[in-house]
Amino acid sequence: MGINLLPIEMDEIRKRLGREPNETEWRVIDAVWSEHCSYKSSKIFLKSFSIDSPNVIMGIKDWQDAGAVDIGDGWAVVIKVESHNHPSAIDPFNGAATGVGGIIRDIISKGAKPIALMDMIRVGNLKIKKNVWLLKNIIAGIAAYGNSIGVPVVGGELSFDDTYNDNPLVDVAAIGIVRKDKIKPSIVDKAGLKLVLAGLTGVDGLGGASFASRKLSGEDEIGAVQIADPFAGKIILDVTLEIADKVEAIKDLGGGGLAVAVTEITNGLGATVDIEKIPLRVKNMNPSDVIISETQERMLYAVEEKNVKEVCEAFEEYEYPCSVIGEITNEPVIKFRYIGKDLVSLPTNVLLNPPRFLWPIKNTKKNVEEKIVDLPLESAIYTVLTHPDLVSKGWAYSQFDYEVNTSTVVKPGDADSAVVSLPNGKLLAIKADANPDMCAEDGYECGKGIVAEAYRNLATVGARGMVAVDHLQFGDPKKAEVYYTFVEAIRGIGEATRFFNIPIVGGKVSFYNENNQGRPIKPTPLIVMAGLVQDKLLKNRVEDNLYVVSVGYTRKELGGSLLSKIFKIPSQAPKVRLQEDLLSSEVVIDSINEGKITFAKDVSRGGLAASLFSILVHGYGVEISTKSILSDTDNVIENLFSESSGRFIVLTNEPEWIVEKSKSKGIVASIIGRVNKKTNILTIDNIDYNLKNIVDNYFNFLEEVMGNG
């Protein structure tokens, strides 16, 4: 049957039902109980993310298709993150494109208008031609769908590691806007509502939820990958927003198809669906396939009978299929019928309550023996600053229509955060962060660290974080070392979000990111955070003679850093001191609001050296003294490449003001250098390093590699 359930789960089903399910019922159970849809190995831990916040309209406790927060003036922001990792490994164009389509439908299922997308892409070594092919097609798929549907891609991440050679990670986040009294649920609260399906059902995506809930085998069928149709997606978007007032609930058809959507929308009630009423793309489809097909560009609506005609007429204007396929019932049973015969008859509470698993854990933390770092500075500078993680991502952004709808305020790559304008005149900053190298060293500190980094990134444009979603991407949870890091990352994320009082209103868990030899990816939890610009927006500007001020304390912490990864330097992972992240961020926000700085960048990937390099790519030079860096080490390499948390560099004409402001907040800051007109020259302790080749590499690397791949 191709069922992905464990023997213990199959025995549990037989016990609960008191009978043997038929083949179609097994396929339904396999979809609804899949890890992808049920969170059976993670849900118990995800509950710890819940924060009671007056701004939360729809949060993690509601378990809906997207989260929503109040932003004032009667408006709400809707936010969601998803991935399409396994499909993108098989068919990168359609895998990535359907990832965009799915996240858009999650946003409109709340009645919200999508206003921004972010893409977070991780692929393997670009010296391998397959990875070049994957990246080309992933970016092309995202661009094709986002550009066609009219939602701008405003930012994201693009990074590279051998761990992703067989398992690219393709994450997409979306932001939507809606009047808060117009938000739609994804579940019903009464029987008698008609189930209306928009869109054609085909044979693509069969078993997709189950496919996403196991490791890649090397023998996976292309049929498990859905096919994207952005023009149909645009119709779904426009009509859904048009008819939102006429429907009671909206549910995207994603993983598990109708099997999952119908089960989840009932909210514990029941439903009866007549399969022969479902519009088909392929004639004479197997009724069982119809139930679990994951054909894209479909939506399910729960509608009062009196409004059904008006809802379907809206789709008919676009010649888009719309049909009443069933109804919500009081009897808590999910029934799929074909020409009067029940093919599926399963209790709702059985489907909605899969077994929960707590797998064994194994502490994989290692006691690292610190060694004196003895590297030639020039070699460290050249090797770290030419790493693909740090080069310009302009090659990717140039393929996106990031200014469509004219809401984009800060262009992709121009700052540490994307910024979009909202209907109430406010500005919303958005950022995504992950740190798999740090997570491989310490899941707990990594969990705290990615939240803190996202918070700092928002601060660099003058925004304060207010809401987040997470995506937790790991290997097989049944492996004790994988599950341990997963649990530790959740502990760190939860601690940090509670500290910053930032509610996580939704997210996703993606397990089984392994190759066919069973090698898992590095643990890759991801945070997407959004927040309102508090007063003034900072658009980075570099000028001659500005002072370089380092805000925050540098520590001898190279573990998980880019330097330690490249040169294999054993070191402890940084300890994330959340109070320092908060206070240094407040210094930066205050400095922006007072008009005291022209440029701000957090210190993270690549350390202080990478942050200084971001000034050089503006066409200037920088001179610094490492003796002026406030730190616990005299080692120049450690000062320049440590990735300690809680730090920024800012450019200012009033450096003493920044130092005093920092002191008033309980944070250290020091004047470490000055900007000059010596283009491409980084002067460190009176020694000039000509970085022209590195600057050229920064702008040209991806275009050259992707053009030659």
Swiss-Prot record:
EC number: 6.3.5.3
Residues binding ATP, per UniProt: Y39, K80, D470, G507
Catalytic function, reaction form: N(2)-formyl-N(1)-(5-phospho-beta-D-ribosyl)glycinamide + L-glutamine + ATP + H2O = 2-formamido-N(1)-(5-O-phospho-beta-D-ribosyl)acetamidine + L-glutamate + ADP + phosphate + H(+)
Pathway: Purine metabolism; IMP biosynthesis via de novo pathway; 5-amino-1-(5-phospho-D-ribosyl)imidazole from N(2)-formyl-N(1)-(5-phospho-D-ribosyl)glycinamide: step 1/2
InterPro entries membership: PRibForGlyAmidine_synth_PurL, PurL_linker, PurM-like_C_dom, PurM-like_C_sf, PurM-like_N, PurM-like_N_sf
Annotated localization: Cytoplasm
Active-site annotation: H36, H84 (proton acceptor)
Ligase found in the keyword field: yes
GO molecular function: ATP binding; magnesium ion binding; phosphoribosylformylglycinamidine synthase activity
Family note: Belongs to the FGAMS family.
Subunit relationships: Monomer. Part of the FGAM synthase complex composed of 1 PurL, 1 PurQ and 2 PurS subunits.
UniProt protein name: Phosphoribosylformylglycinamidine synthase subunit PurL
Source organism (scientific name): Saccharolobus solfataricus (strain ATCC 35092 / DSM 1617 / JCM 11322 / P2) (Sulfolobus solfataricus)
